[in-house]
Amino acid sequence: MEKLTDLNYTLSVITLMNNTLHTILEDPGMAYFPYIASVLTVLFALHKASIPTMKIALKTSKCSYKVVKYCIVTIFNTLLKLAGYKEQITTKDEIEKQMDRVVKEMRRQLEMIDKLTTREIEQVELLKRIYDKLMVRSTDEIDMTKEINQKNVRTLEEWENGKNPYEPKEVTAAM
């Protein structure tokens, strides 16, 4: 008799739910019902999946607070993704990791700038030394005759009798 009563009760609950769903779906204002139902389904699945996970994590881990915080942040991030948001919740640990990464990259870039600055200073010093060596020589000491290959050419003062041998002379010819 009890089984029959349970069966009747179960059938009446199912009938009541079916009637309720049919009346809700017939109402034109409930156009968003499938979306609401899918969100509720996801929330229920997350609830059912997270409770055993949390129990196991709390029993097996030494730092239960971090695990609980990580699980809650993960659940909220999942809900935000389902809602279509691109932003995520981050914990202080993740922010500290990102800050450490940024600081490390800045240090690396500062070292690179320091190396480049040192190299540039060395190049400037080298150019200064080259310039100083070039400026020490005066033009009076440089013998240009070697450069233009004119060692045997005489100047006007060195010519005999001060006459230019290349000037044309009067030539008389017999006819």
UniProtKB/Swiss-Prot annotation:
Zinc recorded as keyword: no
Keyword Transferase tagged: no
Cysteine pairs bridged by disulfides in the record: none
Top-rank lineage group of the source organism: Viruses
GO cellular component, one term: host cell rough endoplasmic reticulum membrane
InterPro entries named in the record: Rotavirus_NSP4
Carbohydrate attachment residues: N8, N18
Keywords: Activation of host autophagy by virus, Calcium, Enterotoxin, Glycoprotein, Host endoplasmic reticulum, Host membrane, Host-virus interaction, Ion channel, Ion transport, Membrane, Metal-binding, Secreted, Signal-anchor, Toxin, Transmembrane, Transmembrane helix, Transport, Viral ion channel, Virulence
Subcellular location: Host rough endoplasmic reticulum membrane; Host membrane, Host caveola; Secreted
Membrane side Lumenal: residue ranges: 1-28
GO terms for MF: channel activity; metal ion binding; toxin activity
Gene Ontology BP term (one): symbiont-mediated activation of host autophagy
Binding site residues for Ca(2+): E120, Q123
Membrane topology listed for this record: Single-pass type III membrane protein
Posttranslational modification: The N-glycosyl content is primarily Man(9)GlcNAc, with a small amount of Man(8)GlcNAc.
Transmembrane segments: 29-51
Cytoplasmic membrane side: 52-175
Major localization class: host cell
Domains: entry comment: Binds 1 calcium ion per tetramer.
Function: Plays an essential role in the virus replication cycle by acting as a viroporin. Creates a pore in the host endoplasmic reticulum and as a consequence releases Ca(2+) in the cytoplasm of infected cell. In turn, high levels of cytoplasmic calcium trigger membrane trafficking and transport of viral ER-associated proteins to viroplasms, sites of viral genome replication and immature particle assembly.
Self-association state and partner proteins as the record states: Homotetramer. Interacts with the immature particle in the viroplasm. Interacts with host CAV1, early and late in infection. Interacts with host integrin ITGA1/ITGB1 heterodimer. Interacts with host integrin ITGA2/ITGB1 heterodimer. Interaction with microtubules blocks trafficking to the Golgi apparatus.
Family affiliation: Belongs to the rotavirus NSP4 family.
Name the UniProt record assigns to this protein: Non-structural glycoprotein 4
Organism name: Rotavirus A (strain RVA/Human/United States/DS-1/1976/G2P1B[4]) (RV-A)
